[in-house]
Amino acid sequence: MAEAGMRKILIIGIGSGNPEHMTVQAINALNCADVLFIPTKGAKKTELAEVRRDICARYVTRKDSRTVEFAVPVRRTEGVSYDGSVDDWHAQIAGIYEALLSKELGEEGTGAFLVWGDPMLYDSTIRIVERVKARGEVAFAYDVIPGITSLQALCASHRIPLNLVGKPVEITTGRRLHESFPEKSQTSVVMLDGEQAFQRVEDPEAEIYWGAYLGTRDEIVISGRVAEVKDRILETRAAARAKMGWIMDIYLLRKGADFDE
């Protein structure tokens, strides 16, 4: 809870691209905000901002709130380690957040950041807000509102359970997939994979459930044995990226039956 005379921030999970993913709690939170902050990521990713605008147009009923758009800097990848690159990027964004809060939000105002999916899963908004808070230049309290993740949307579109009965689930990146699947994990969800690491899975029984642009009108899903569908996924992914200018995908790898025989 925010103290009297203190700014308040709402970090709102908005789902994975379908405005109907918005929960009642998220809609109510939108309508508590005086200022709605919408990130933009360049001409190639205008749809990400457009979904947020659509959500505000659909669900914000108060007349006195306003939207403020801000550009998200591109993460530098050359000449720096991955961890260093991410840290520098987060520092840049923290500076932007700090400026937004001090310039756009009154001392007792409430601002909302609309976060793709759920803020707890492979998103850095909470970390960045904590960084701003630690700097101490702007005093505020914040709450987090959960949302539907791309992982939930993936399982729903493929009509599969996330886990095998009584078995654990691993959530990892493409860079680290080789460390676990299929030897140590029967179910691995890959959230970030610029290398399409699934094509290096050699187990003939491994299944893949892949999805891109989940929840949006451009959603694509493919499933099957990795050996049988990997080339189709690679081709489909490349074509979609060329058409859209960006790609946002996720997949689940499985070793074992989804349903009992």
Swiss-Prot record:
Query: Where, if anywhere, are coiled coils annotated?
Result: none
Q: Return the EC number.
A: 2.1.1.152
* A Pfam family matched in the record: TP_methylase
The Gene Ontology biological process terms listed for this entry are: cobalamin biosynthetic process; methylation
Top EC category: transferase
Alphabetical keyword list: Cobalamin biosynthesis, Methyltransferase, S-adenosyl-L-methionine, Transferase
Q: Annotated pathway, please?
A: Cofactor biosynthesis; adenosylcobalamin biosynthesis; cob(II)yrinate a,c-diamide from precorrin-2 (aerobic route): step 5/10
Catalytic activity as recorded in UniProt: precorrin-5 + S-adenosyl-L-methionine + H2O = precorrin-6A + acetate + S-adenosyl-L-homocysteine + 2 H(+)
User: What's one GO MF term for it?
Assistant: precorrin-6A synthase (deacetylating) activity
List the NCBIfam families: CobF
UniProt name for this protein? Precorrin-6A synthase [deacetylating]
What's the gene? cobF
